[in-house]
Regions:
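Mixed-charge, Lys/Arg-rich low-complexity intrinsically disordered regions
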Residues: 1-11
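Short, solvent-exposed secondary-structure boundary/capping segments
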Residues: 32-44
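Short connector loops at helix/strand junctions that flank enzyme active sites
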Residues: 10, 19, 44-45
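Short beta-strand-centered aromatic/proline hotspots
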Residues: 14, 21-32
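Intrinsically disordered, low-complexity, charged/polar segments
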Residues: 46-97
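A general structural signal for short secondary-structure junctions and capping/turn motifs
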Residues: 7, 14-17, 40
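Short, flexible active-site loop motifs that bind/organize anionic cofactors or intermediates
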Residues: 2, 14, 60
Length: 97
């Protein structure tokens, strides 16, 4: 993760990735790709998303990516005090690791 937690886009944000054309809607942050298995560590991504406007189309149709992969932010999702508190708590947890 190269982006600071407080700089992550909010859920509901819609982006286009570099080398991409289809908009994606972010529905989660700080996601892991699987459990890593016996001999490898799970890879962590900044975001998990689905196609927009289609939404979730089934298994294998979610997209994990990092902030640096974003080419364009089309829409910034909803932000409020609860989100700020959540990001502060998340940031504290990562600092402990």
């Amino acid at each position: 993760m190269n982006v600071k937690i407080k700089d992550l886009l909010p859920i509901g944000s819609i982006v286009i990735l570099k080398d991409g054309e289809q908009p994606l809607m972010i529905y989660g942050i700080m996601q892991r790709d699987g459990d890593g298995g016996l001999f490898k560590k799970a890879k962590e991504y900044d975001y998990v998303s689905v196609l927009y406007p289609q939404g979730h189309l089934g298994h294998g149709m979610t997209f994990l990516f990092n902030h640096e992969d974003i080419k364009e932010i089309i829409f910034r999702g909803y932000e409020n005090e609860e989100r700020t508190k959540f990001l502060n708590e998340l940031s504290e947890q990562y600092e402990k690791q």
